[in-house]
C-alpha cells in the first residue's frame, strides 16, 4: 500500500488552503489579499506528480515492499502560510494573507470548503522513513517552487485561472475579518 501526500501537478492545478478553486491566483496577480484558515500555521506536505510516479515505480518488483505500507512523502513540510508565500514568489507578487477561523468560513458558506474542513485546516505530517529505508532510490527532486512554476505555466497556457472579480465571497469575508481583527 502506497499512501502519497498531497500530490499536485499541471493537471490538478495549484491548490489553496481554504477552497478547491483557482481564483486565488488571479487575486494575487491583481494585488488583492487572500484568505487562509486560522493563522495558516497548519503543516502540510506536498509531492509533485513526477516525483510521486517515481516513488510508485521504484516500489515495483521489490520483494521487501510486498505487504508493506508506505507514506510517499517529502521529508520537508511547510505551513499553509509559507505555501502561499512560496506561490506568491513564483507568481511575482506579494499580497496580504488574511486569517479567518474555519467556523467563520463555514458560516459564510465558502464554496468548495470541504477539502479545508476535512484535511487542510489540520496538521498533516507523515513520516517517509520507511520508504527511505526500503526504497532508497526514492527521493523527491522537484522543489515546491519549481513544481508550482510548472503548474502555473500549464494553467496559464490552458486558460484555467478564473477571473476573481466575478466572485464576491472572499472580499466579503476578508472585510468581516479585518473589522474584527484577522489572525
Q: What do the predicted segments below correspond to?
A:
Residues 9, 37-42, 70-77, 88-90, ...:
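Glycine-rich Rossmann NAD(P)(H)-binding loop
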Residues 142-183:
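Amphipathic terminal alpha-helices
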Residues 1, 5-43, 87-89:
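NAD(P)-dependent short-chain dehydrogenase/reductase
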Residues 49, 106-138, 157-161:
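Conserved C-terminal active-site "lid" loop/helix of NAD(P)H-dependent oxidoreductases
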Residues 47, 75-78, 126, 142:
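Residue-level signal for the nucleotide or nucleotide-sugar donor/cofactor binding architecture
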Residues 16-24, 37-60, 67-68, 146:
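Substrate-positioning beta->alpha
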Amino acid at each position: 500500500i502506497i499512501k502519497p501526500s498531497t500530490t499536485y501537478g499541471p493537471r490538478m492545478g495549484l491548490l489553496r488552503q481554504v477552497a478547491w478553486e483557482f481564483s486565488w491566483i488571479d487575486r494575487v496577480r491583481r494585488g488583492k489579499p487572500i484568505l487562509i484558515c486560522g493563522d495558516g500555521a497548519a503543516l502540510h506536505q506536498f509531492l509533485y506528480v513526477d516525483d510521486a510516479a517515481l516513488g510508485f515505480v521504484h516500489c515495483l518488483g521489490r520483494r521487501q515492499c510486498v505487504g508493506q505500507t508506505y507514506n510517499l512523502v517529502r521529508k520537508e513540510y511547510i505551513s499553509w502560510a509559507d505555501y502561499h508565500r512560496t506561490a506568491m514568489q513564483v507568481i511575482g507578487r506579494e499580497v496580504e494573507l488574511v486569517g479567518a477561523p474555519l467556523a467563520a468560513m463555514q458560516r459564510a458558506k465558502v464554496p468548495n470548503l470541504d477539502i479545508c474542513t476535512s484535511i487542510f485546516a489540520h496538521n498533516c505530517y507523515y513520516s517517509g522513513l520507511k520508504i527511505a529505508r526500503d526504497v532508497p532510490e526514492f527521493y523527491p527532486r522537484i522543489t515546491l517552487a519549481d513544481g508550482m512554476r510548472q503548474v502555473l505555466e500549464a494553467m496559464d497556457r490552458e486558460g484555467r485561472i478564473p477571473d476573481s472579480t466575478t466572485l464576491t465571497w472572499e472580499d466579503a469575508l476578508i472585510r468581516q475579518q479585518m473589522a474584527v481583527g484577522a489572525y
